[in-house]
Amino acid sequence: MPYVYANAKALQDTEKVGNHHQCVELIQHYIRVGQASTWQQGAAVFGNKNIEVGTVIATFVNGRYPNHNSGNHAAFFLGQDTGGIWVMDQWKDDIAKPRVSKRYIRKLHNGSVRSDGTYIRMSNNAEAYFIVE
C-alpha cells in the first residue's frame, strides 16, 4: 500500500525540515512511513499512469532503500511526462536548492541499469524510482 501526502504541492518554497535536511527527513516529517530501512519497493514510477500526486517514491537496490549518505533519494511524486518525472524534495547540501522545491528528474538516454541491476545516477534517473510500500 503506497503512502500519500495529499498536500505535497503546497510544500513548494517551504523551509527544509529535519536535523540534517536529508531527503528522507522531508518524507518522515509530513507522513508516517517508518524508518527507511523498513521501506519496501513497490511498482516502478516512470511510465506508471496510476500514481497519485503526493505518493512517496524512492530509489531502491535489490528491493531495499540503501539509506546511504548520498547516491539514493526519496521524494513526493508530483507527475510525469515522456521525458521524466516531477518530484517535491529537499537536498541537504545543494546551495542551488536552499528550500523544499519541485524538481524534474529526466529519463537517462544512455542506458540506465548496470549489469548488477543497480541504476546509473540513481538520484537523477527517473527510471530508478519506485513507490514506497
Curated annotation (Swiss-Prot):
Enzyme category, top tier: hydrolase
Residues at the catalytic site: C23, H73
Coiled coil stretches, renumbered: none
Enzyme Commission number(s) from the entry: 3.4.-.-
UniProt effect for mutating C23A: No longer degrades peptidoglycan
InterPro entries with a match to the protein in the record: Dae2/Tae2-like
A GO molecular function held by the record: hydrolase activity
Keywords: Cell wall biogenesis/degradation, Host periplasm, Hydrolase, Secreted, Toxin
Places the protein is found: Host periplasm; Secreted
GO biological process: cell wall macromolecule catabolic process; cell wall organization
GO CC entries: extracellular region; host cell periplasmic space
Main location group: host cell
Pathway: Cell wall degradation; peptidoglycan degradation
Xref: NCBIfam families: BPSL0067_fam
Family: Belongs to the cell wall amidase Dae2/Tae2-like family.
Its biological purpose: Toxic component of a contact-dependent interbacterial competition system (also called effector-immunity systems). Secreted by the SPI-6 type VI secretion system, probably into the periplasm of bacterial target cells. A cell wall amidase with specificity toward the D-meso-DAP-D-alanine bond (D-meso-diaminopimelic-D-alanine) found in peptidoglycan of Gram-negative bacteria. Toxicity is counteracted by a cognate immunity protein Tai2 (t2585), but not immunity proteins associated with a similar endopeptidase in other bacteria.
Protein name as annotated: Type VI secretion amidase effector 2 protein
Organism in which the protein naturally occurs: Salmonella typhi
